[in-house]
Amino acid sequence: MENIGTILRLAEDKILLVQNLKALQEYKVEFLGKNGIVTGELKKLGSLNEQERKEFGLKINKLKDKIQNIIKAKAEILEEQELNFKLAADKIDLTIPARRYKQGSIHPITQCSEELIQVFSQFGFTIENGPNIENDFHNFTALNFEDDHPARQMHDTFYLKSQENNKPLLLRTHTSTVQIRAMKNGKPPFRFIAPGRTYRSDSDMTHTPMFHQIEGLVMDKNINMGHLKYVITTFIKSFFENSNIELRFRPSFFPFTEPSAEVDIRMNKNDKWLEVLGCGMVHPNVLKNVGIDSSEYQGFAFGLGVERFAMLKYNIKDLRQFFEGDMRWLKHYNFGSFDIPNLAGGLTK
């Protein structure tokens, strides 16, 4: 009887002084474990008579319950203390200035490409893609380039060591190659644009060895220059968001179109005319090369440089700046990730 009281006081003294849950668990094992103090007292029941065993067993069970309650109460206190400590350690000091969030931005070429694509999508144009590495047929022959055309020369075109049909492969010099592939693999009518990288051996303030083009093709029955002029005029005014912009279609020559024209624009009457794109009716020889009957279908094509349009719209003077990676320049000419272009809300930020 006296031993039970001593055990209870010992348990109370030890448990009340515990500072963490790990130590509390150790005391739980010490008193209530398989080889614990209370368990040791229970083993004494075998040496008692029936009446003594009944009385002593009742007292031991009460002792066990009291110690369990003491441990439970202490555990709740320690858990609350640990939670409060963790919350205090994780507390945010609202008086500390926030760190500047380093957010990326959209490159002007990407933004301009998206704006151009968005405008053409209003006309119902879809997007076609093709490989950057091309063969001679798709890049030149199918587009009605003569064998001695200057564009085929080494100083204008990047040729590769790999060959196809005894002719070297090359980096495409325009995305007109996509038009050839699409016409070969499909059937008219067509209405699509082909955005992508193109490559030419040239480098100065207005030329880089790699640049971005968007070329377009419309083909159906009874297509004429009037349709071409309407699409180009509406596109230019929409992209530059200027209904008063002036355009002129100047006669020109391209192997793959006949008649051909270059389009010049000026924002105001006192400005100089600026060349922005080339266009024309698809040459009958091109249609023949892709298996389309030119007596039944006609079409027009156009091509523009994305960098050229970006320079005009964003007032960028040197084409090479697009690719130099100057962080100061990129921070100045940048667009937010959510500046999604649309005609209804205005195309630019």
From Swiss-Prot:
Q: A single GO CC term, please?
A: cytoplasm
- Please give the cofactor(s) recorded in the UniProt entry for this protein: Mg(2+)
Give TM regions.
Answer: none
SUPFAM superfamilies linked to this entry: Class II aaRS and biotin synthetases, tRNA-binding arm
* Reactions the enzyme catalyzes: tRNA(Phe) + L-phenylalanine + ATP = L-phenylalanyl-tRNA(Phe) + AMP + diphosphate + H(+)
What EC number(s) is this enzyme filed under? 6.1.1.20
EC class name: ligase
Q: How is the cofactor bound?
A: Binds 2 magnesium ions per tetramer.
Q: Which GO terms describe its molecular function?
A: ATP binding; magnesium ion binding; phenylalanine-tRNA ligase activity; tRNA binding
**According to its UniProt record, where is this protein mainly located?**
cytoplasm
- Localization, UniProt: Cytoplasm
Which biological process annotations from GO are given for this protein? phenylalanyl-tRNA aminoacylation
Q: Which Gene3D superfamilies does this UniProt record tie to the protein? A: Bira Bifunctional Protein, Domain 2
Q: State the UniProt keywords alphabetically.
A: Aminoacyl-tRNA synthetase, ATP-binding, Cytoplasm, Ligase, Magnesium, Metal-binding, Nucleotide-binding, Protein biosynthesis
* Family indicated by similarity: Belongs to the class-II aminoacyl-tRNA synthetase family. Phe-tRNA synthetase alpha subunit type 1 subfamily.
Question: Which PANTHER family does UniProt cross-reference here?
Answer: PHENYLALANINE--TRNA LIGASE, MITOCHONDRIAL, PHENYLALANYL-TRNA SYNTHETASE
Known partners and oligomeric status: Tetramer of two alpha and two beta subunits.
Q: Which HAMAP family match?
A: Phe_tRNA_synth_alpha1
> What's the protein name?
Phenylalanine--tRNA ligase alpha subunit
* Source organism (scientific name): Rickettsia rickettsii (strain Sheila Smith)
Q: List the top taxonomic levels of the source.
A: Bacteria, Pseudomonadati, Pseudomonadota, Alphaproteobacteria, Rickettsiales
